[in-house]
């Protein structure tokens, strides 16, 4: 199975940050277009990319039901929750994120990386799924990409973490039976009060 990240030229001047999913037998299963487009120092993607319009996607592969979310999507619990509710057993996050080499310290770098890993491990716990986050390494245009790709189980336990500075290829075995186990122990999906969540669709909740 391949999750291929690409810059999709949909039309002249219309570009998406996209992943294509190809199954183990070579069958093309579909694509997901990145929904959340950042515009912050070092990551001015709104200049290049249009927000996705595929909605969130779940793909039935020969090995598991998977969801793909791209980079900045990983900071939004709503994206992970919706993809999990669609039936995904594993959430994949292809990523290119790092530090400004001129402005950060080792302490700040460590704090940012830990925040990045923590938010994704929380998606694993809250949704009872495995998370696979794959980040690039190296330096480009003043950004040192922090690597540190990792795999977490539904309890948020890190099963593997890659080095920060060296690209690696790693096979990690996961047990999808743990999804059911942890969802039965911590039945967060069962206990959701979906009738109370409408306010989350507001940009901000103003005082009345």
Describe the predicted segments one by one.
Residues 18, 31-33, 161-163, 171:
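Residue-level detector of high-confidence beta-strand sites
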Residues 23-24, 59-62, 153-154, 174:
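Active-site beta-strand termini and strand-to-loop segments that position acidic
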Residues 9-11, 139-140:
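Short glycine/acidic-enriched loop and turn motifs that connect beta-strands
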Residues 34-48, 166-184:
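A short, polar/charged loop-to-alpha-helix boundary motif
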Residues 54-89, 93-95, 179-208:
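Cysteine/selenocysteine-centered motifs that mediate thiol-based redox chemistry or coordinate metal-sulfur cofactors
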Residues 4-6, 18-21, 57, 149-151, ...:
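Short beta-strand scaffold segments in enzyme catalytic cores
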Residues 21-29, 152-159:
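Short, glycine-anchored, charge-dense loop/turn motifs used at functional sites
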């Amino acid at each position: 199975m391949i999750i291929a990240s690409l810059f999709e030229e949909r039309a002249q001047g219309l570009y998406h940050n996209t992943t294509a999913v190809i199954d183990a037998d070579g069958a093309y299963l579909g694509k997901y277009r990145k929904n959340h487009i950042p515009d912050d120092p070092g990551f001015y993607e709104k200049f290049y990319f249009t927000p996705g319009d595929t909605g969130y996607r779940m793909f039935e592969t020969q090995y598991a039901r998977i969801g793909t979310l791209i980079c900045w999507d990983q900071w939004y619990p709503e994206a992970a929750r919706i993809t999990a509710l669609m039936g995904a057993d594993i959430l994949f996050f292809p990523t290119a994120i790092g530090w400004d080499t001129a402005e950060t310290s080792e302490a700040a770098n460590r704090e940012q990386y830990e925040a990045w890993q923590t938010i994704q491990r929380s998606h694993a716990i809250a949704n009872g799924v495995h998370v696979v986050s794959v980040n690039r390494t190296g330096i480009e245009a003043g950004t040192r990409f922090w690597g540190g790709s990792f795999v977490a189980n539904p309890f948020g336990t890190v099963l593997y973490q890659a080095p920060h500075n060296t690209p690696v290829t790693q096979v990690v075995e996961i047990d999808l039976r743990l999804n059911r186990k942890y969802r039965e122990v911590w039945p967060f999906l069962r206990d959701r009060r979906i009738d109370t969540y409408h306010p989350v669709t507001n940009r901000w909740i103003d005082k009345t």
